[in-house]
Amino acid sequence: MPKHGKRYRALLEKVDPNKIYTIDEAAHLVKELATAKFDETVEVHAKLGIDPRRSDQNVRGTVSLPHGLGKQVRVLAIAKGEKIKEAEEAGADYVGGEEIIQKILDGWMDFDAVVATPDVMGAVGSKLGRILGPRGLLPNPKAGTVGFNIGEIIREIKAGRIEFRNDKTGAIHAPVGKASFPPEKLADNIRAFIRALEAHKPEGAKGTFLRSVYVTTTMGPSVRINPHS
């Protein structure tokens, strides 16, 4: 195991490893644990009672956090015709069609989210799949990033909508705000994310769905929480 520095060990002493904290307690505690010189991201890590090898048990969805993420999300919209203007008016940072696909093929990646209309997905998938797919940026209807209602999609992402999906170990990791948020807003965002997770419980999943849930900051130790508190 890697050795942690003195700062981390001091923070670890503030966390009771045998206690399962309420969401409100954790929201206050993680603010104390965020001592880095930058505004740390607060994340939720959940271990799910699913078999990730089975496609019918994979969990994937989106949730609009009530207080956003506390950061500006750079949205790229790929569309054509009238939808280009709609995307621009909705606040997309970059909008284009074939020319922007070529720009990405040339190495440009200055964006955080990609949305597209269905009529361009053939080109997007075939040309950009290998580039955007591994980065989790490829537009997908299940993730709510493909649709002719592209203006609505962009506004939701800008307001703090996040995508979540389990990894190959059956765990999910998602940002829920910044350490600078008031604890009440962090707690609201955590609860909204947990409700969204539970709404996506697969029918075939047996036993306890949320096996363990932790809240952590970018550089701090994790705090186990009761997801129903």
UniProtKB/Swiss-Prot annotation:
InterPro entries named in the record: Ribosom_uL1_bac-type, Ribosomal_uL1, Ribosomal_uL1-like, Ribosomal_uL1/biogenesis, Ribosomal_uL1_3-a/b-sand, Ribosomal_uL1_CS
Disulfide pattern: none
MF term (GO), any: rRNA binding
Pfam families registered for this protein in UniProt: Ribosomal_L1
NCBIfam families xrefs: rplA_bact
Domain of life according to the entry: Bacteria
UniProt entry keywords in alphabetical sequence: Repressor, Ribonucleoprotein, Ribosomal protein, RNA-binding, rRNA-binding, Translation regulation, tRNA-binding
Function: The L1 stalk is quite mobile in the ribosome, and is involved in E site tRNA release. Binds directly to 23S rRNA.
KW Repressor (keyword) present: yes
Gene Ontology biological-process annotations: regulation of translation; translation
Recorded family membership: Belongs to the universal ribosomal protein uL1 family.
A single GO cellular-component term on record: large ribosomal subunit
Name under which the protein is recorded: Large ribosomal subunit protein uL1
Gene: rplA
Subunit-structure text: Part of the 50S ribosomal subunit.
UniProt entry tagged with the keyword Plastid: no
Chain coiled-coil ranges: none
